[in-house]
Amino acid sequence: IIHGIDFVLDVLDFDQRAQDADFIIVGEGRMDQQSMAGKAPVGIAQRTSAKATVLAICGSLDQEISDYEAYGISACFSIIGQPESLSEALDNAEVNLRRTSLSIARLIKNVRGNCID
């Protein structure tokens, strides 16, 4: 018996495809203690080479989670930019995801000193 994420990563030939990556970006609806217990983002982070930085984008981030680096995730970014109800967060998810992704892309561009198209 293997973990589901390991099966999926094997089928996708993840190790080979990600071997030269500088960054791996993972996603999670809500990053919480359950996420740290072996859900996809942690499974991916644990299979990522030490040279790659793993970043997580999540719908919401449990403030109790501060040790994600111990699981191989360098930084977590919640897409929620302001207090809002769950209904509003779901309605605004696409806009919030685009905004957060653009901010991360700009950060990577500044760190690398290269253009991102």
Where do the protein language model's features map onto the residues?
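N-terminal loops that bind phosphate or other acidic moieties
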Residues: 1-117
